[in-house]
Amino acid sequence: MTTALQRRESASLWQQFCEWVTSTDNRLYVGWFGVLMILTLLTATICFIVAFIAAPPVDIDGIREPVAGSLMYGNNIISGAVVPSSNAIGLHFYPIWEAASLDEWLYNGGPYQLVVFHFLIGVFCYMGREWELSYRLGMRPWICVAYSAPVAAATAVFLIYPIGQGSFSDGMPLGISGTFNFMFVFQAEHNILMHPFHMLGVAGVFGGSLFSAMHGSLVTSSLVRETTETESQNYGYKFGQEEETYNIVAAHGYFGRLIFQYASFNNSRSLHFFLAAWPVVGIWFTSLGISTMAFNLNGFNFNQSVLDSQGRVINTWADVLNRANLGMEVMHERNAHNFPLDLAAGEATPVALTAPAING
């Protein structure tokens, strides 16, 4: 008997690593974008958790009045945040080695920049990883295009807006109440509710929720029954089956009669494209709106635009909103400036026309 031995060429360690990274047989696909994503998101997550729990107060306004954001300094889950870096730092890149000491780095809010920059690189890489996996599986690339909407939104509030305003202290705090504070101040300074791109974003988010609920309920209501009355209809579907699991003709007929004929889709592909495109385009517009308002191209101003025949102002909801904006602007950064710029820039209102005569 003859035994034939084939010599197996052992691949180098680097080649094995390359094959593992790009293999679509792994339980979770890594990919080249994933290598960088794992490193940056781990760094951002670890720094965020440590800073949220134990970071000392940060001099966010650059006026030597630190703001506490961590749990160990009296906050809870709702009020806690990683406080943005100091206004004294501005737009300067502020890694640990740029500070004279670790205490100075913490006092000036260095962890905020560390978390934000690594987080943004991480989500960019996640988007690239979606494209990479689609490419290797022979799929079309639209999944990463859809994900670009939240990526654009995060980039707008964490990077574009601080650049436009001239300081990372104007970036969105990394916490729940800090996010709400950011929203209030953004409304006060930029009147975002009156910006058409924000309106398109609201239509995209709420409309997407409505269309998703409508689609899910129509499909669930028009399933092709494959089970008995005593079994769940969900058991009638087998993963990978070729047959349609619901009757699109029935769903089309129902919705066409409920609204009108042309409000209903008769093409499943165009329907699902619409379901994906509506919220994505809306969030794109909101991100674009925040990016333009970053450079103070603000929402519409219809203040005092309705006058009576005598020239007196008839207040509209725009005037009510303007009053709320001024109130919010007075409240924020109350120690950094004594008066909102909108009010301080106006003409002085006389409180007395003539000095009162005393003792005639």
UniProtKB/Swiss-Prot annotation:
<feature type="binding site" description="axial binding residue">
    <location>
        <position position="198"/>
    </location>
    <ligand>
        <name>chlorophyll a PD1</name>
    </ligand>
</feature>
<keyword id="KW-0813">Transport</keyword>
<dbReference type="InterPro" id="IPR000484">
    <property type="entry name" value="Photo_RC_L/M"/>
</dbReference>
<feature type="transmembrane region" description="Helical">
    <location>
        <begin position="118"/>
        <end position="133"/>
    </location>
</feature>
<keyword id="KW-0148">Chlorophyll</keyword>
<feature type="binding site">
    <location>
        <position position="215"/>
    </location>
    <ligand>
        <name>Fe cation</name>
    </ligand>
</feature>
<dbReference type="GO" id="GO:0031676">
    <property type="term" value="C:plasma membrane-derived thylakoid membrane"/>
</dbReference>
<dbReference type="InterPro" id="IPR055266">
    <property type="entry name" value="D1/D2"/>
</dbReference>
<dbReference type="GO" id="GO:0005506">
    <property type="term" value="F:iron ion binding"/>
</dbReference>
<feature type="binding site">
    <location>
        <position position="332"/>
    </location>
    <ligand>
        <name>[CaMn4O5] cluster</name>
    </ligand>
</feature>
<dbReference type="InterPro" id="IPR005867">
    <property type="entry name" value="PSII_D1"/>
</dbReference>
<feature type="site" description="Stabilizes free radical intermediate">
    <location>
        <position position="190"/>
    </location>
</feature>
<keyword id="KW-0460">Magnesium</keyword>
<protein>
    <recommendedName>
        <fullName>Photosystem II protein D1 2</fullName>
        <ecNumber>1.10.3.9</ecNumber>
    </recommendedName>
</protein>
<feature type="binding site">
    <location>
        <begin position="264"/>
        <end position="265"/>
    </location>
    <ligand>
        <name>a quinone</name>
    </ligand>
</feature>
<dbReference type="Pfam" id="PF00124">
    <property type="entry name" value="Photo_RC"/>
</dbReference>
<dbReference type="GO" id="GO:0010242">
    <property type="term" value="F:oxygen evolving activity"/>
</dbReference>
<feature type="binding site">
    <location>
        <position position="126"/>
    </location>
    <ligand>
        <name>pheophytin a</name>
    </ligand>
</feature>
<dbReference type="GO" id="GO:0009635">
    <property type="term" value="P:response to herbicide"/>
</dbReference>
<feature type="transmembrane region" description="Helical">
    <location>
        <begin position="197"/>
        <end position="218"/>
    </location>
</feature>
<feature type="binding site" description="axial binding residue">
    <location>
        <position position="118"/>
    </location>
    <ligand>
        <name>chlorophyll a ChlzD1</name>
    </ligand>
</feature>
<feature type="binding site">
    <location>
        <position position="342"/>
    </location>
    <ligand>
        <name>[CaMn4O5] cluster</name>
    </ligand>
</feature>
<dbReference type="GO" id="GO:0045156">
    <property type="term" value="F:electron transporter, transferring electrons within the cyclic electron transport pathway of photosynthesis activity"/>
</dbReference>
<keyword id="KW-0793">Thylakoid</keyword>
<dbReference type="InterPro" id="IPR055265">
    <property type="entry name" value="Photo_RC_L/M_CS"/>
</dbReference>
<keyword id="KW-1133">Transmembrane helix</keyword>
<feature type="transmembrane region" description="Helical">
    <location>
        <begin position="274"/>
        <end position="288"/>
    </location>
</feature>
<feature type="site" description="Tyrosine radical intermediate">
    <location>
        <position position="161"/>
    </location>
</feature>
<feature type="binding site">
    <location>
        <position position="215"/>
    </location>
    <ligand>
        <name>a quinone</name>
    </ligand>
</feature>
<feature type="transmembrane region" description="Helical">
    <location>
        <begin position="142"/>
        <end position="156"/>
    </location>
</feature>
<keyword id="KW-0106">Calcium</keyword>
<feature type="transmembrane region" description="Helical">
    <location>
        <begin position="29"/>
        <end position="46"/>
    </location>
</feature>
<dbReference type="InterPro" id="IPR036854">
    <property type="entry name" value="Photo_II_D1/D2_sf"/>
</dbReference>
<keyword id="KW-0464">Manganese</keyword>
<keyword id="KW-0560">Oxidoreductase</keyword>
<keyword id="KW-0604">Photosystem II</keyword>
<feature type="site" description="Cleavage; by CtpA">
    <location>
        <begin position="344"/>
        <end position="345"/>
    </location>
</feature>
<feature type="propeptide">
    <location>
        <begin position="345"/>
        <end position="360"/>
    </location>
</feature>
<dbReference type="GO" id="GO:0016682">
    <property type="term" value="F:oxidoreductase activity, acting on diphenols and related substances as donors, oxygen as acceptor"/>
</dbReference>
<dbReference type="GO" id="GO:0009523">
    <property type="term" value="C:photosystem II"/>
</dbReference>
<keyword id="KW-0602">Photosynthesis</keyword>
<keyword id="KW-0479">Metal-binding</keyword>
